[in-house]
């Protein structure tokens, strides 16, 4: 059976940041909440199976919460930045936790759906200079990050025959 990789680089880190900065005490939902995120993956798994393919999920890459915070607050006033930090509970680490929550949901979904998942997160975290794997926005893979992921995927594909020829 042919296998197909299901890769979605986004996590739940897409919010209306300007709206949050203007009203940090309000209720704010991500552009794609966790339920919709899992449903999107579940649909993609079902589509692959409907086409006679075996789906294989790929975990999310790492992110750098401090760089991402700087990126999403560029152009904001100091007060807006403080408001956003307030909404995050006073720590940019909350951004990493949200990202990790979405990534962990992929591993749970893989187990529930009985599909393989390729862990690209761990080799990135194991890198001595993981910050070099990301662009300045803290979430986009740099050329070095893309190379690490490509190497990891190639190794696993070769070793375990994850893609049929």
Residue spans for each PLM region:
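Alpha-helical cap/lid subdomain in secreted, periplasmic
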Residues: 1-143, 147, 151-165
